[in-house]
C-alpha cells in the first residue's frame, strides 16, 4: 500500500455511556460542567501518553516520535453558512487530568470563537490566501519539500494544524452524525 488512504479502515462501534452520563451529571451537581467532547479529548490524551507508539509518524520511510501530544480541532466561529472556521492545535503533556483538559478546551474554544481573535494558524492561512494561485502551488510544494527533508521552520510547524497527534472535531452542533474523513497524505497527522 503506497498511501495512507490505501491502508485506512472504517469501523463503527456503539458503546453504552450510561455510566458516563451519570458521571457528567454528578459533576454538574458539583458545579463542574463536563461535555462528551472533554471526556473524549481526555481519554485520547491519556491513551497517547500511555501508548507512545500511537504518537509516531512515518516520513520518507523513517519512523519518528513527536515531541509532545497535540490535538487539532476546527471551531466554527458562527453557526451559519457564512460562518468563519478556525483551526487550533492544543498541546498536552499527557499528565493533565480531565478537569485541566476540560478547562483548556473550553477556554480555547471561547477565545477562538471571537471574530476579533486570530491564532497562528489563522495568520498563516491568511498569508497563503492572499497569494496568487501559481505562487501558492509553489509555496505549498516548497513547504512539503522542506517538511519531507526535516527542514521546515519551527514557526510553520507550530502554526500547522497538520503537524499533530490527532485531528478531532465535534460536529454535533451541525446536527449531523459522525463522519468518516479521508486521511491526509501530507505532513504528519493521522
Could you say what each language-model-derived stretch is?
Residues 1-190:
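C-terminal catalytic/motor cores of large multi-domain enzyme assemblies
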Amino acid at each position: 500500500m503506497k498511501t495512507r488512504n490505501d491502508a485506512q479502515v472504517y469501523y463503527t462501534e456503539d458503546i453504552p455511556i450510561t455510566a458516563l452520563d451519570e458521571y457528567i451529571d454528578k459533576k454538574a451537581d458539583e458545579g463542574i460542567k463536563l461535555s462528551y467532547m472533554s471526556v473524549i479529548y481526555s481519554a485520547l490524551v491519556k491513551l497517547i501518553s500511555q501508548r507512545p507508539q500511537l504518537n509516531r509518524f512515518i516520513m520518507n520511510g523513517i519512523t519518528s516520535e513527536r515531541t509532545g501530544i497535540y490535538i487539532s480541532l476546527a471551531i466554527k466561529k458562527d453557526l451559519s453558512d457564512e460562518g468563519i472556521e478556525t483551526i487550533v492545535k492544543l498541546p498536552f503533556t499527557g499528565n493533565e487530568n480531565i478537569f485541566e483538559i476540560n478547562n483548556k478546551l473550553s477556554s480555547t474554544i471561547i477565545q477562538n470563537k471571537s471574530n476579533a481573535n486570530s491564532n497562528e494558524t489563522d495568520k498563516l492561512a491568511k498569508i497563503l490566501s492572499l497569494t496568487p494561485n501559481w505562487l501558492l502551488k509553489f509555496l505549498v510544494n516548497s513547504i512539503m519539500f522542506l517538511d519531507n527533508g526535516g527542514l521546515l521552520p519551527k514557526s510553520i510547524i507550530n502554526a500547522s494544524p497538520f503537524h499533530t497527534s490527532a485531528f478531532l472535531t465535534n460536529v454535533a452542533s451541525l446536527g449531523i452524525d459522525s463522519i468518516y474523513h479521508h486521511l491526509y497524505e501530507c505532513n504528519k497527522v493521522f
